[in-house]
Regions:
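Bacterial N-terminal signal peptides that target proteins for export
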Residues: 1-7
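Bacterial N-terminal signal peptides
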Residues: 8-15
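Conserved catalytic or regulatory cores that recognize and/or transform ribose-phosphate-containing ligands
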Residues: 19-177
């Protein structure tokens, strides 16, 4: 009986020690439409973030690239779902259906949604996504009073307890906490 107790104590000690070790930082993964997570990746090792926000049919600032660099430097392991396509071809058969369904699926599956409204943009799809996911508990919204519907965003976020930040850096700081 005493041997069993010693064995159990040693086993528990090893488990506790292994949990306390610093885990090696894995590269931040960025997944776009028409891409999948590599098969050899343990999805449980990563937290996922959907990058919702201004794209303006590709003419908007590529803020998603800056976000990827910030997450690469941040502690933790991250997979970013980025809906921006480098070569968007709306004439491709069923492309719009694919894109919308890809976005909705990844919005639902993500651990966090980082939503960025750029000043000077209209971002109608992002406003739609705000309405769809305001109650999800996953949203972190970046919006300044330079966005033409700032008050709508601010009021909606306040109603549902969604934090609003003035910068991507501030929002990411809260996500990685």
């Amino acid at each position: 009986m005493k041997r069993i107790h010693i064995f159990v104590l040693l086993t528990l000690s090893l488990i506790i020690i292994s949990c306390g070790r610093n885990q090696e930082k894995l590269p931040t993964l960025v997944i776009h439409p028409h891409e999948e997570m590599p098969g050899n990746i343990d999805k449980k090792s990563y937290k996922s973030v959907f990058l919702a926000g201004t794209i303006d049919m590709g003419s908007g600032v590529d803020w998603q690239k800056d976000v990827a660099e910030l997450f690469e430097k941040a502690p933790g392991n991250w997979v970013l779902f980025n809906p921006r396509q480098e070569f968007w071809d709306p004439s491709r058969e069923n492309e719009m259906d694919y894109q919308v369904n890809w976005e909705l699926s990844h919005l639902e599956d993500a651990d966090f949604i980082l939503m960025n409204f750029l000043p000077g943009s209209k971002s109608p799809i992002t406003l739609l996504e705000l309405g769809l996911f305001a109650k999800s508990g996953k949203l972190h919204v970046v919006c300044t009073d330079g966005f033409y519907r700032y008050d709508n965003v601010r009021i909606t976020c306040a109603k549902y307890g969604v934090p609003v930040y003035a910068s991507l850096t501030e929002a990411i700081g809260e996500i990685i906490r």
